[in-house]
Amino acid sequence: MVDYTEKLSEITNISNYADIQQNIEKFLKNMVSQKKADGVVFGLSGGIDSVTVAYLAAKVFGKKALALVMPDSTVSPSSETGDALKVIGELGLDYKLIDIDVIHKIYSNHLEPDERALGNLRARIRANIIYYYANLKNYLVLGTSDKSEYLIGYFTKFGDGSADILPIVELYKTQLREFAKFIGVPDNIVTKRSSPNLWKGHYAEEEIGISYEKIDTVLYCIENWSDFTVDEFLDNMTGISKKDVEKIYQMYQNTQHKRILPERAGSIYGDF
């Protein structure tokens, strides 16, 4: 048996970040070329995921990368918006600052109140705006999900999960932190607590109840062991409770519908 931190060190001990960066940049160029798009657009919150995507997009596309900063001023910390605008200034990105507060309130006035549903509505409003500009400018939408959040379904379906390309989805959150440092993302962004900002005081690890270090260790084993079971994990790893392993595995299993296209009806016409 080994402590989970030993496995985590294997996950984050990547020596070829330069190759990873080159491969992502090549992927972005190829996708935009293949789809005959004129550039890319993405939401920029000021968090590590979207800032990492901003650094990659700025290098590959320059002014053909449009960053949309879309706070809801009633819930989004002003420091987040400030960080996003500072990154834009440093990278010289084309951008638009759109406060979605008014749009969200118009919806809310006609809907019964529910914090989670209205929080996810914020993500879906942002997705609508991003795709509006994608349509307007013939741009592809860059998603900002990392592998950890993608695999546990920690994103809003048809909200921040909506994208044409997912450039950082093969990097677990703990790997992304190291990669972000490598490409020059500022330390205050790298060390910042992850937050979807769907409501006031909304932080990812607090909502999930488990650290990304533990999440990534379990997800790595789910992805790489031939026949993962909770009991097998607990037989081989210490430092993570059975309750947490079960929760991560259930999130992985129960959110698969978020990672696939809608189910299609089979033959509805019968035999001919």
Regions from the language model: what does each represent?
Residues 124:
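Catalytic-core regions of hydrolytic enzymes
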Residues 2-40, 56-59, 63-66, 73-80, ...:
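ATP/NTP-dependent adenylation/nucleotidyl-transfer catalytic domains that generate, transfer
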Residues 47:
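Conserved G/P- and acidic residue-centered "switch" motifs that form tight phosphate/ATP-binding loops
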Residues 50:
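Catalytic nucleophile loop
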Residues 53:
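Short, charge-patterned binding micro-sites
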